[in-house]
């Protein structure tokens, strides 16, 4: 359900919706989480789990995560990388209202360098031409946002989070 009016009690003349007395409480707008991975479930090694699940199981888990997110007060999320675009099914169902969940903007496959952070499920792209092609592929697949793995990360064994993974030229091509 959506909030259709917020006003002092005396200003609801003629209003036909449900009225909720929030006296003594605090009303917050929906929260936004700008970095989630719906297909992950908080485990230390998401790669092993995802490699052992079938696509339908991954989608159902992502739906459950989306619904948990909404119940926690987060009404909009940005999913920054999933598995084989499976999170797009969750995004489309939630955004269309067919399923209960937050508003979702999804990146699709993370764009990463060979051997870099996210390379197991990401779209590997080395050099400016490959980065440009990878960005175009994500747009064609229906991505709302693009995620470029500019540095290493903590979830990929043997990768230093402080290391640069793309040159300035590669990043410019990916952003332009």
Name each model-derived stretch.
Residues 47-60, 116-134, 160:
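Active-site mouth loops of central-metabolism enzymes
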Residues 89, 129-176:
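Histidine/acidic residue-rich metal-binding segments in metalloenzymes
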Residues 29-47, 102-123, 151:
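N-terminal small/glycine-rich loop or linker at the start of catalytic domains
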Residues 25-96, 169, 173:
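Metal-associated gating/positioning segment near the N- to mid-region
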Residues 1-28:
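Histidine-rich, glycine-flanked metal-binding segment
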Residues 16-26, 87-98, 128-144:
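Short amphipathic alpha-helices and their capping/turn segments at secondary-structure boundaries
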Residues 61-87, 101-112, 143-156:
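Divalent metal-dependent hydrolysis catalytic cores, especially in the metallo-beta-lactamase
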Residues 1, 24, 32-35, 73, ...:
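Divalent metal-coordination and catalytic microenvironments
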């Amino acid at each position: 359900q959506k909030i259709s009016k917020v006003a002092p009690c005396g200003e609801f003349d003629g209003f036909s919706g449900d009225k909720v007395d929030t006296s003594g409480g605090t009303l917050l707008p929906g929260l936004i989480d700008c970095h989630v991975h719906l297909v992950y479930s908080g485990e230390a090694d998401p790669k092993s789990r995802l490699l052992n699940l079938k696509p339908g199981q991954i989608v159902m888990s992502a739906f459950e995560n989306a619904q948990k997110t909404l119940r926690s007060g987060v009404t909009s999320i940005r999913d920054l990388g999933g598995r084989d675009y499976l999170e797009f099914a969750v995004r489309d169902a939630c955004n269309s209202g067919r399923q209960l969940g937050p508003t979702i903007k999804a990146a699709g496959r993370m764009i990463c360098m060979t051997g870099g952070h996210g390379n197991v499920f990401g779209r590997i792209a080395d050099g400016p031409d490959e980065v440009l092609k990878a960005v175009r592929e994500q747009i064609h697949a229906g991505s709302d946002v693009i995620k470029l793995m500019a540095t290493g990360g903590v979830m990929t064994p043997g990768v230093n989070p402080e290391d640069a993974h793309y040159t300035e030229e590669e990043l410019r091509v990916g952003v332009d």
